[in-house]
Amino acid sequence: MAYLFLDAGDSVALSEPVYPGAMAAFRAFTERFIPVPLDAQGMITTELERLLAKRKAAGESLPKFIYDVPNGNNPAGVSLSPERRGHLLQLASKYDLLILEDDPYQLVQLEDRDPLPTLQSLDPEERVVRLDSFSKIFAPGLRLGYASGPAEIIRYFQL
């Protein structure tokens, strides 16, 4: 995703703390990040909204995409609440942004509840590119993952 979308000078909005592996991948292409704090309900989307509005009002470029691990955020361990999932999608629509949903823990539910819906399943505008993995439930050593999303984006993932 970083290779496909990031050019020098581009920025990425992401929850902080962020998964170190993702940060390493992004840093190969940019050093500009818009950190968004999180709490027990995940990324604080009202803070993201404030940061995006501030950048837009100042004439600054918006991030190329929003990156989040919505279930079992690594390293924080929190999940994005249903309300914030909806708000995040509203912000992506309002500011014409993509969301990179890195969700290797969707199938690993440690709580006694139904899994939360994926951002992609809630997205009527095809703004979400979803990264999934079998590594957490099947074979951790294989590092087996896949991406799904809008066809016009996923076609660039083909080998």
Model-derived regions: residue spans:
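Short, Asp-centered acidic motifs that coordinate Mg2+ and/or phosphate
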Residues: 64-65, 97-98, 129, 144
